[in-house]
Amino acid sequence: MTHIISMERLEETVFRSGGSGDNWHMTWAEDDLQYVGLCDGQGWPEMAGYVRKERGYNSRIYAIRGDPPDIRFIHLPGFPDLLSEEAPNVNRYYGFGIIALGSCIYQFLSTPNHPFTSGPDPRFVGAKLIYSQDLGKSWLNQDGSPVHWEPWAARSRANMVFLNEPGETFSLLTVVQMGRNYQHNRDGYVYVCAPNGNVEGSMNQLVMFRAPRERLLERASYEFFVSRRRDGSARWSSDISARGSVHTFPAGWVNTKLHPYAWHPSVTYNAPLGLYLMANWGMGCDANGMWFGKPSYLGFWIAPNPWGPWEQVHEETAWMPEGDANARAYQPQICPRWIAEDGKPFWLAYTDFQPQQPRYCFNCQKVLIRTR
């Protein structure tokens, strides 16, 4: 595994796409497009086929063509509308983990326990799995039926791939990326990671499951990481209660006000350097535990395997793109198509929670890796 000396965000390269939205989990498909999830935004009005919605989209998928700064977002008309609604937000989901395998695209959408604006202790407690067999032209539920956005009362383990699991684990999912069309995968498994819960002490623990790539729709095929052996190989179990922690992130970066939201990673195989690269973030809280009270934590880690062991190679306890002390950056996403041929520069997408435009949008910045 390549030895990394340092990493640097290149401030002069910050690119803001316009439009609005956040989170930006993405995958690189066989058609050479990246497919990206948007949450809570209007998208890009200049897109062909764009239809403005009064309150915007709760969650949607778009395609991306090109390289920064010359990129174009592509509207996918076949994605079922999931709109931001007035309270009580009857159909609210958040599209996060995504993976392209051949002509199929799979996406995990996280479900809260109830609308964030009503009821006590709002938090993410599960995930719905949908998929497309034709690179985003049409979409199906996990059971093969047309996508239906179940309202709160209708969500159950019959239609959610995870729901109210032990410790509320596997509610914020990230799929490990391995190049265009998953081409760098060698063992036939898809790897998915997540925070282990919703409170300090569990949310900063990383857990993982794997599934054969042809059986990702079958919850019964999932194996959960238990531990690493001395030789670096992993123990797996079909019992979610036997899960172990892949890695533990620093304490003190989980909010207690509004819904807990932190330590939701991005993991991508960097083929030129022969290592897995992870970006992750912690929530900057004020003295009362309110989210976005100060700049976020940003870190990068590397590992020889998806299950680690993970070594930290970069840390910022005040993540401030362009040196802006008002920045409230979050959800760093390693863009899998935008890794250079030598693996050293790559592009990192993120959102900034500052209310003014153009920061609440698809921002990206080049990051430079220095090696020995």
Predicted regions, residues:
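Long, hydrophobic, well-ordered secondary-structure blocks that form the structural core
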Residues: 102-210
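Structural signature of eukaryotic scaffold interfaces centered on beta-propeller domains
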Residues: 16-31, 86-106, 113-115, 161-188, ...
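Conserved blade-ending motifs and adjacent loop-strand segments that build the rim/top face
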Residues: 307-339
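Beta-propeller domains
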Residues: 1-17, 27-90, 109-154, 294
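Active-site cradle of extracellular carbohydrate-active enzymes
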Residues: 144-160, 186-305, 314-320
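Short glycine/acidic-enriched loop and turn motifs that connect beta-strands
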Residues: 41-46, 112-116, 197-201, 283-287, ...
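Asp-box/BNR beta-propeller loop motif
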Residues: 66-71, 130-141, 214-215, 303-312, ...
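Blade-level signature of beta-propeller repeat domains, shared across WD40, Kelch, NHL, RCC1
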Residues: 334-372
